[in-house]
Amino acid sequence: MRSTTRSIAACWLAGVSLAGAAGPEDARAPLPPASVACLRCHPSAAGVLSGPMATRAAEKGFARRAFGAEGDRFFAQSCTGCHVAGCDDCHGARPHAGRRPGNDACTRCHRGYFVGWDYLGRAPREDHARYQRGAVADGEPFLKMLPDLHAERGMTCADCHTMRSLQEGRRAAKTCAECHPAVSRDVPEHAFAAHLEKMTCEACHAAWAPQEYGTFLVNAESAEQQEAFSPLRAWGPWRKSAYLRQQDAPPLGLDEKGQVAPIRPQFVLFATDPSRRWENRLLVAEWKAFSPHTIRRGTVTCSECHDSPRRFLLEPEAERLYELEKDGLPLRSFWSRDQQTVTNGSFLPEDRHEAMNRKTPEYVRQHLRQWQRLLDRAAPRSGR
C-alpha cells in the first residue's frame, strides 16, 4: 500500500471503522490493470475493492464533521495513502504463490491507534521526536505491551478476518461464542446473565487499549513557529500532539447493538491556526465503540466497573484530576459526557449505571467468590 509518514498519521486520526457505506462523492479511483485481471476469476473480491478500506468513506466523513466545508481539503492534504488501491496491496505481486496475507500485510495500515497493532502487543508512542525510540515495527517505534492471547497461540489476523467476511463487509468471520460456545457459569463473572447477554466479551476480557485524550493540531505559520513545532509529527500543513495517552482498560459505553462495550476518543480534536484566529478550538468531540484486540483469560475485579463512574464518563467533579478549562481548553473533562458523543453507539444511561451499582445479595456473594478464587490462586501450592 502507498504509505508516507504524513498519510499514515492522518489516516490514524481520521478513522478506524470498517463500517459505513460510500456515497457517490466517495467513489474510488480506477483499479490498476492487475486488479482488473484478478476480478475476472475472483469477482467476489470486488466487495473489498469497493468497501470502506478502499473508498475511505469513514475518514472523509470525520474530516467533514471536524472541518465542515474545509473537510475535503483537509482530507486531500493530509490523508493521501494507506488504503486498499488494488489486490497487490494485501496479496503482493505473486498472489498465486499459495500463501494468504500475513499479519504484516494488515499492520502496514492497522498500526498506531488502529486496532491491529494492539493484537501483537504494540501501542503508539508519544508524538514528540524525543519519544521515537526503542523497538520498531512497520517503520514506527512502539511501546511493548501484553499481546492478545490468540496471538500468543499463533493465530493470525486472517484466522478471524477471512477474505469472505471482508468481501461481505463484515468485521469478522466468527463471533467469540462460535469458537467458545461452552461458557462456564461456575466462573463468578459468568454467574450473572446480564454479563453474558448485555455485554461484549471485550468489555471484560480486553486487558488494555490505546487511548488518546485530546488530539491537537497546530498550523505553524512563521519560521519561528515551524521550528518550535518541528519535533512533532507532520500532517500536511499541521503538526500533531496529544494532551494525554493511556494504555489501560478502556472506558465503557454502548455499541450500535446496545451492548456494553469498550469505547475511546476518536477523536476529541482541538486545532490552533493563527490564520483562522483559532486557539485550541474544539472541532469535534467524538468517541467510538470498538473491539480492542488485547484479549486475556483474566478480567478486572468487580469494583473496576461497578464502583468506577469515571469509566462510564460520569466522573465526579471532586475526583477530577485534569482541569482542562484552566489549561485554556473549551471542555470540562474528558470523562464528562458534556459536549461529547459516541458515533456508533451511546453512553450508558445514568439510570442503568445507578442500577448496576446496587449491591444486591447476589452481587456481594459473587464478589466474595471472585476474591476467594484470586486468593486460592495466589496461595502457595505444595509439591510444585
Predicted feature locations:
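Hydrophobic core
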Residues: 13-18
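C-terminal, active-site-flanking charged/polar segments
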Residues: 200-213, 218-239, 297-340
